[in-house]
Amino acid sequence: MLTVAILAAGKGTRMASSLPKVLHKLSGKTLLQRVIDSCNELKPDKIFIIVGHKSKEVKDSVFKNNNIHFIVQKPQKGTGHAVQVLSQKVKKHDGKLIVLNGDVPLIKGETLKKLIHYHDSQKADVSLITTKKKNPHGYGRVFAKDNLIEMIIEEKDCNNVQKSNLLINAGIYCFNWKSLSKIINTIKSNNKQNEIYLTDAIYLLKKSYSFEILDNGELQGINNRVQLSKCEETIQNLIKEKHMLGGVTFINPASCTVSEESIIGKDVIIDANTHIRGNSKISNNCKIGPNTFIKDTIINENCEIINSTIFNSVLMDFVNIGPYSHIRPNCEISSYSRIGNFVEIKNSQLDKEVKVNHLSYIGDSTVGKHTNIGAGTITANFDGKKKHPTFIGENSSIGANTVLIAPINLGDSVTTGAGSVITKDSQNNSLAIARTKQVNIENWKKN
């Protein structure tokens, strides 16, 4: 039986945030969820998440499944106390127990598997991951001989000589559950912080081993925003390298971000300052950016987007967007359509070869194929209480500076006169003009 305990009860005061530390995000996922995802690669029988500070928020953030359980640690008196609380709540202490913090988001499932294998090979009571750091500031120091641990001292309790030791405790343990259960509740808070340290279990167990790995960055804990930023950079580099090896060009990778969930096809060019978030999918031969933000959007082949923002929409093949377009949620823009500068579209469906080239707002609208929307066109869809739809048929031409007062239905091949305010439906093949007759006053002088 394999049990995992993730320690997520702390406040994270050094983050200087009202949000619990484990709920800060890296590339769209919370620190805690990243640790859970890595632990799930072990296929554990149960995962216990030890919560405390703002426990409801932490619980609500987790993607639930049947093997995840929550235990409240109150008050929070250290890592050893957290496992004491766990031990009192869990009736069976069989097999192995993995204990790790919820703020090590880069830890790999493969590394945890290696820890378990090492633990089994040594028939250990406890094995913990260690590594040598050039700058070990903030970490407890491990003192071992032939991988047998002699002592672990938290940095706060180290003297200057002990601080010179570079072998650190990564805070990731594999325990023999039965061995741990016999001694866990005997640990006391005999330290400057008046906390119960899990590391004190090392002295009470007979076979305590150091599993040393190279410092490749995955053991980085997060205690402040600087460390959060460094981890974000690490994750982003891995994501972008994967896409580049798969056939994507980044003009300036350092200025771009891509979510892990996003899918990008071959021969896509991502220009500088472009950010692709959420569950976005970009198909082959697209050009994206510069200065573009895309979230939860499907972009089909041969599209070009420049200096624009797109949320939760679908673009079919050969669509051109931008510069300075804003495509809001629930839009579908069909093939060979063109959305130009300073155009906002929301909750609308545009059929093939529709052109909205500049300075327009199209909301809650359906536009037929081959229709041209002139500059300055506005669909006035809100009456102060409700949103109303606009329907424009095929092969229509909406004149510049037209206002369409919804609800309204324009048929196929309808033309509106420039500067019109259209309030009534228009039938197929009609011309709609709604503006006052021009009056010229001769010999006019300003006062």
UniProtKB/Swiss-Prot annotation:
Its cofactor is Mg(2+). Residues 247-447 are annotated as: N-acetyltransferase. Residues 226-246 are annotated as: Linker. Pathway: Nucleotide-sugar biosynthesis; UDP-N-acetyl-alpha-D-glucosamine biosynthesis; N-acetyl-alpha-D-glucosamine 1-phosphate from alpha-D-glucosamine 6-phosphate (route II): step 2/2; Nucleotide-sugar biosynthesis; UDP-N-acetyl-alpha-D-glucosamine biosynthesis; UDP-N-acetyl-alpha-D-glucosamine from N-acetyl-alpha-D-glucosamine 1-phosphate: step 1/1; Bacterial outer membrane biogenesis; LPS lipid A biosynthesis. It comes from Prochlorococcus marinus (strain MIT 9515). The gene is glmU. GO terms for molecular function: glucosamine-1-phosphate N-acetyltransferase activity; magnesium ion binding; structural constituent of carboxysome shell; UDP-N-acetylglucosamine diphosphorylase activity. Keywords: Acyltransferase, Cell shape, Cell wall biogenesis/degradation, Cytoplasm, Magnesium, Metal-binding, Multifunctional enzyme, Nucleotidyltransferase, Peptidoglycan synthesis, Repeat, Transferase. InterPro entries: Bifunctional_GlmU, GlmU-like, GlmU_C_LbH, Hexapep, MobA-like_NTP_Trfase, Nucleotide-diphossugar_trans, Trimer_LpxA-like_sf. GO terms for biological process: cell morphogenesis; cell wall organization; lipid A biosynthetic process; peptidoglycan biosynthetic process; regulation of cell shape; UDP-N-acetylglucosamine biosynthetic process. In the N-terminal section; belongs to the N-acetylglucosamine-1-phosphate uridyltransferase family. In the C-terminal section; belongs to the transferase hexapeptide repeat family. Residues 1-225 are annotated as: Pyrophosphorylase. The active site is at H358. Acetyl-CoA binds at A375, A418, R435. It catalyses: alpha-D-glucosamine 1-phosphate + acetyl-CoA = N-acetyl-alpha-D-glucosamine 1-phosphate + CoA + H(+); N-acetyl-alpha-D-glucosamine 1-phosphate + UTP + H(+) = UDP-N-acetyl-alpha-D-glucosamine + diphosphate. Its EC number is 2.7.7.23, 2.3.1.157. This is Bifunctional protein GlmU. Binds 1 Mg(2+) ion per subunit. Pfam families: Hexapep (PF00132), Hexapep_2 (PF14602), NTP_transf_3 (PF12804). Gene3D superfamilies: Hexapeptide repeat proteins, Spore Coat Polysaccharide Biosynthesis Protein SpsA, Chain A. Homotrimer.
